[in-house]
Swiss-Prot record:
GO terms for cellular component: plasma membrane. GO terms for molecular function: antiporter activity; xenobiotic transmembrane transporter activity. Multidrug efflux pump. Keywords: Antiport, Cell inner membrane, Cell membrane, Ion transport, Membrane, Transmembrane, Transmembrane helix, Transport. This is Probable multidrug resistance protein NorM. Coiled coil: none annotated. One of its GO terms (biological process) is monoatomic ion transport. The chain crosses the membrane at residues 57-79, 100-122, 142-164, 173-195, 205-227, 248-270, 280-302, 323-345, 360-382, 401-423, 433-452. The keyword Transmembrane helix applies. Its main location: membrane.
Length: 468
């Protein structure tokens, strides 16, 4: 998408459904690859930490998970930047964009303060939860390094992933993210093992490498944004505005809560599966990992829908906003249906990427993982639907009711249903996954219904203004 593509569209007739689909896919593709690149960095860290032994892997893995949970929740607040920019551009008020950018920049730095504080107290927090003292100490040391990456993550991932797509610069995220995978792998190996002339830091080398990579990513994205004449007018120097910061926070904090509600659902499900034994937990991790990779695509489509629905809503074109949302929902469901078909057709091949299928010791895990992938085929469709629906509603600046819907669906329906199926109906891990599917399906239906109602009401209000 060209940087001026939205502006040209504002003066033209509303796009056809096929044009909506093409524009959404064009915007979502680099976002999906950027998110997959972030997953690749995590996999690299895990593999290289594993070379140091189980203790390093456990401490580094838990420390990294703690970091990413904290910053991901806070990044949810910054999703308000993209919809605010999209609305401003749709309304042909691009002079407001620099104010949104610099206010969002200041907000990202403020959000880094609680992230830094939480990560500073990782060791006492883990001790309070009864973790072994040695593990808590190692995780505390790992998090103490990663805490310095919090501002860079909130700027380079939180702010830039919201701002760049909204001004038509999503491809910058793509190339910088891909480069970050290589830089992270090089620094991880070098700092863990003392290779390439770098100091040998052991498992803390991984935290140091991740911190450096995150900051390099943030600095590069900011430099590309400010250095290109095409985008410079979007970031013209101006002071952050406190009322605008309150508006951005008001839109964004329910998104952060929604992220937290969903994250805790999957965390609680994993802990509950662990009660069923190691084979069940291993099968659960395999199925969840596969589903997480596929989820990156509808997540990106949801981010694209956020921008496109917001743009057309800001332009005062409610029909185009409605079409943009439902086309995005269709794309998300279509992709996840194809992905689910792969899980149904080739589950053994997928499980074989994680385990040796001919090893008798893996037999129970293979059977259960194959079964869970079948459930994941259904789970994925509604998961994609709910995340795209959430993005559509963010485009209308509607975040508080979706937060309540997610809380109800995940914790009022999903987890209780899964628990009952697992322990009262005797389905074990499969029951918990059916519970996840039920919770996600309820949220998907609520999000879709809410978008239908909100977008229809937007059209009614526009018609009333036109008649007046």
């Amino acid at each position: 998408m060209s940087p001026t593509g939205f502006t040209r569209a504002a003066a033209a007739p509303p796009p056809t459904l096929s044009r909506h689909a093409a524009d959404t896919a064009r915007l979502a593709a680099p976002l999906a690859i950027a998110q997959l690149s972030q997953m690749a960095m995590s996999v690299t860290d895990t593999v290289l930490l594993g070379s140091l032994g189980p203790d390093a892997l456990a401490a580094g893995g838990l420390g990294a998970n703690l970091f990413f949970v904290v910053v991901t929740l806070l990044q949810g607040v910054l999703t308000s930047v993209s919809v605010s920019v999209a609305h401003a551009r749709g309304a042909m008020a691009e002079d407001r964009v620099p104010h949104i950018y610099w206010t969002g920049f200041a907000l990202s730095l403020l959000l880094a303060v609680p992230a830094f504080a939480l990560l500073s107290f990782a060791q006492p927090l883990l001790l309070a939860f009864g973790e072994p003292a040695a593990l808590a100490r190692n995780v505390g040391e790992y998090a103490a390094v990663l805490r310095f990456a919090a501002p860079g993550s909130l700027i380079g991932v939180g702010l830039m992933r919201s701002f760049l797509p909204a001004i038509g610069a999503a491809k910058r995220l793509l190339w910088v993210s891909l480069a970050g995978v290589g830089v992270n792998a090089f620094l991880n190996y070098g700092l863990i093992h003392g290779a390439f002339g770098l100091p040998r830091l052991g498992f803390l080398g991984s935290a140091t490498a991740t911190t450096i990579t995150i900051w390099l990513t943030a600095i590069t994205l900011v430099a590309l944004l400010h250095g290109r004449s095409t985008f410079r007018h979007f970031v013209a120097a101006t002071r952050p505005r406190l009322p605008l910061m309150g508006e951005l926070f008001g839109i964004g904090w329910p998104v952060a809560i929604t992220y937290g509600v969903e994250s805790t659902l999957f965390l609680a499900t994993g802990l509950t599966v662990g009660v069923l034994g190691e084979s069940s937990l291993a099968a659960h991790q395999i199925a969840l990992n596969v589903a997480s990779v596929a989820f990156m695509v509808p997540l990106a489509i949801g981010q694209a829908a956020n921008v496109r629905v917001g743009y057309w809503a800001g332009a005062g074109a409610p029909v185009a906003a409605r079409h943009a949302g439902f086309v995005a929902l269709g794309l998300g469901v279509a992709f996840m249906s194809l992905s689910g078909l792969v899980l149904i057709v080739a589950p053994h091949a997928i499980v074989g990427l994680y385990l040796k299928l001919d090893d008798p010791a893996n037999a129970r895990t293979v059977v259960l993982a194959t079964s869970l992938l079948g459930i994941a085929a259904v789970f994925q469709i509604v998961d994609g639907m709910q995340t795209v629906g959430s993005g559509c509603l963010r485009g209308l600046k509607d975040t508080r009711v979706p937060m309540l819907a997610a809380t109800l669906g995940y914790w009022g329906i999903g987890f209780p249903t899964g628990y009952w199926f697992a322990f009262h109906a005797g389905l074990g891990a499969r029951g918990l996954w059916w519970g996840l599917a039920a919770g996600l399906a309820s949220v998907a239906m609520l999000m879709t219904w809410r978008f239908h109602r909100k977008s229809a009401a937007l059209g009614v209000r526009a018609d009333a203004r036109g008649q007046a």
